[in-house]
Structure formats: structure tokens, C-alpha cells
Amino acid sequence: MARNMNILTLFAVLLGSASAVYHPPSWTAWIAPKPWTAWKVPPPAWTAWKAHPPAWTAWKATPKPWTAWKAPPPAWTAWKATPKPWTAWKAPPPTWTAWKATPKPWTAWKAPPPVWTAWKATPKPRTAWKAPPPTWTAWKAAPKPWTAWKATPKPWTAWKAPPPAWTAWKATPKPWTAWKATPKPWTAWKATPKPWTAWKATPKPWTVWKATPKPWTAWKAPPPAWTAWKATPKPWTAWKAPPPAWTAWKATPKPWTAWKAPPPAWTAWKATPKPWTAWKATPKPWTAWKATPKPWTAWKATPKPWTAWRATPPPTWTAWHGHGYGGYGKPGKPGKPGSKGPRGPAGPPGATGKTGRTGATGKRGPPGYPGKPGVPGRNGYVHIVFDGYGKWEIGKIERKNIREAVAKAWTAWNAGHGHGWTAWTAPPAYG
């Protein structure tokens, strides 16, 4: 099994190296230097701002008043150093020490039998079978084609560096550092007791009103005309279907289908017979050995002379156990985990909780992604896009304004995401 896995791993590595070396022309062209390389370098102001201010460095270096408080008190240190009266009580009794030093009758019984020792010393037939095949050993020692590729500098190393403007901005001090250090006026206000604390604890008159049924419950239900209208088919269902041009394009064969197909060399290799197929089909020498009865099977089934000895403790053990020093035995093996107990009865229903307060307004969400272009309409296109800040922009756009509207939506999306990709790729063209 291990040999098969080694061979499969070899072909997986070879296939992975081949796929890593080959790139289509579009990939090679894209690897060229990008216009956003300089933009990604952090400005010097940022690099300087990230550094610790001198006040912080000096504060860290000054001794703190709580260092002495954290040290243990002298009384504890002195108590730890004094000898304890229970040290002698914890020592094992002399009878236990003498018993441990005497040879035990079961020492010889625990030794493995001579036939086992001899069998362990003989060479096994599976030793040679477990060694890796010579082809694998030679392949492991041969130089690999991807070693040189890994050692060459890559063109994207410089692209990953942050831009200088970002580094400079990081290094400049920020105006909010001092504001954070000043005490705030609301700190004291938060600590004072509030007048509404007692009001919240008193029962409210609207608690009973909330529990009574309201006359407008039936009024809120949708009218039957609305329910019937929802169930009838709508004339715009067919209008929402994709245009025939899209359906026809989806049905035509694409030029990249052949590019995605596996290379002929891989297909041919898969079809050729493999050398390990015959090896798997041949009978193995250990199959017969596994089927033959073993000499230790009968030995395991016969009663052992030490079974009775284990059941009856010797008198010396019983007498010694009366000393009360039984805590010096070896720790027992951990017990097996217990089975799962029966399911307990259901608890009483909990009390109805109070209505929670209205939550605070949430933070602005992340920028949205551009929507897909709408299907054709009577006045050109109904174009639905994101404006780059998580809001929908829906409206009818004339055909002559399609390109301008899409370009604006694309630029807004780039600005909302903070990426400078406008120079890298042009907005999609519609109309």
C-alpha cells in the first residue's frame, strides 16, 4: 500500500510541476509590471506614525509602583523555607522500603518466553518488501526541473511592496493621539446614578395594555383582492426572461473549451497499462501465512497458573495494607468513559422576558459590488448597479447614455472599494 502511494505521489508531483511551468499567453502578459505597484507602497508618514512615541518608550522604561506589590510577602517566603512536620509522615514506611528491595517471584514470569525472543531475532520476509523500489530512490536523488525556477527572482516581488506614500503617512504623528489621551467629560457622567434607574424598575401601565387583543389585528391582514392579484400570472414574467441573443451565445461552443481539456500526454499516460497493475494481481507470500493457524492461539486459550495467584493477595500484602500507607501504590490506568445517561425530564417553561430596547443604528456596511446589467426594455435598458456604497441605483437609461452610465457606476464602485484599478482595466462596454 505504501509503495502504491509513493508511485501515485510521484506522478502527482510531476503533473503539478508540469502545470506550474506552463502558462497561457494571457497569463504571461498579465504578469508584466502593474500600474498599482507604486500605489501599494505605504507612505513614509504611515511608517513614522506606526513607531512608538518617545513618551510611551520612556514610560515602559520607568519602574512601576506595582512591582513590589506583586512580589510575595516575606512571611510567605519564610514559611516556605521552614521544614514542615508532614515531611516525615509522607515518607514510605520501612517495611515498604524493604519489600521493594527484595526480589519478586513474578520477575521471571514476566520475562518473554524464549521462543518469542528467538522469533524476534530472526529476519522477516517482509523486510525487503517494505523497501522503496529502485526507481523511486533514483527519482528522489535526481535534480528536479523546478529547483532552478524556485531560485530565480520573481517579477511580482516588487509589486507586493507597499507604496512610498503609504509608508510616509504611517510615519507621521496623528492628531487623534492627543485626543485619546485627554480625559473625556462623559466619564464622570457615566459614573453618576441616573434618575431613570428607579423608573425602569416600577411596573408600567402599558404592560396590561400590551397583553390585551387589539382591534386592528384583522385590519392589518392583506385584503382579498391583493391575495388574488398575487396569485394571478403577471404580464412581465416573459419580459424578465433573458434575451434571445444571450440564450444563443450560451448554446454556441466556446474557444476556451479546448484549452481547458487535459493535454494529450496526460490522456495517453492514463490509457497506458501501469507496472503496478500486474503486481497487485499476483498472490502475496503473506496471504498464506495469515491463513495458517498460529501456535500462540492454543496457548492463549489454555488457563494460566497465575490466574489464581492474582485473585488471592499474599498474607504479607494483607498485613502491610493495615499500616494505612496505601497511598504509595502506582496510579491506576484511567477508566473507560461511561455510557451516556438517560435523558432528563424537561424543565419548567421559563418566564417571558422583557421587551428589549431598540438597538443603536448600525455602522455603515462594506461597499457593495456592481450589479449585473438589466435585461432590454422598451426605452433602451433598465440598468441596475451598485453605486459603490451599498445602495441600489435603478432607472431607465436611454441607449445613447448606456456607456456613460456604466462608466460612472464602475468608477463609483472603484472609489467605494478604495482600489486604483481604473487604469488597469477599462469599464465594460454596453450599448
UniProtKB/Swiss-Prot annotation:
B- repeats lie at residues 61-70, 81-90, 101-110, 121-130, 141-150, 151-160, 171-180, 181-190, 191-200, 201-210, 211-220, 231-240, 251-260, 271-280, 281-290, 291-300, 301-310. Keywords: Glycoprotein, Hydroxylation, Repeat, Secreted, Signal. It is found in: Secreted. This is Foot protein 1 variant 2. Almost exclusively composed of repeats of the decapeptides APPPAWTAWK and ATPKPWTAWK. Its main location: secreted. Residues 1-20 form the signal peptide. The modification 4-hydroxyproline is found at residues 33, 65, 72-74, 85, 92-94, 105, 112-114, 125, 132-134, 145, 155, 162-164, 175, 185, 195, 205, 215, 222-224, 235, 242-244, 255, 262-264, 275, 285, 295, 305, 367, 370, 376. The modification 7'-hydroxytryptophan is found at residues 46, 49, 56, 59, 69, 76, 79, 89, 96, 99, 109, 116, 119, 129, 136, 139, 149, 159, 166, 169, 179, 189, 199, 209, 219, 226, 229, 239, 246, 249, 259, 266, 269, 279, 289, 299, 309. Produced by the byssal gland. The keyword Cytoplasm does not apply. The modification 3',4'-dihydroxyphenylalanine is found at Y22. Residues 323-332 have a biased composition (Gly residues). It comes from the Eukaryota. GO terms for cellular component: extracellular region. Residues 336-366 have a biased composition (Low complexity). A- repeats lie at residues 41-50, 51-60, 71-80, 91-100, 111-120, 131-140, 161-170, 221-230, 241-250, 261-270. Residues 41-270 are annotated as: 13 X 10 AA A-P-P-P-A-W-T-A-W-K. Residues 329-380 form the Collagen-like domain. PANTHER family: COLLAGEN, CUTICLE COLLAGEN DPY-2. Residues 61-310 are annotated as: 27 X 10 AA A-T-P-K-P-W-T-A-W-K. Residues 322-377 are annotated as: Disordered. Provides adhesiveness to the mussel's foot. Mussels produce one of the strongest water insoluble glues. The mussel's adhesive is a bundle of threads, called a byssus, formed by a fibrous collagenous core coated with adhesive proteins. Glycans are attached at residues 46, 49, 56, 59, 66, 69, 76, 79, 86, 89, 96, 99, 106, 109, 116, 119, 129, 136, 139, 146, 149, 156, 159, 166, 169, 176, 179, 186, 189, 196, 199, 206, 209, 216, 219, 226, 229, 236, 239, 246, 249, 256, 259, 266, 269, 276, 279, 286, 289, 296, 299, 306, 309.
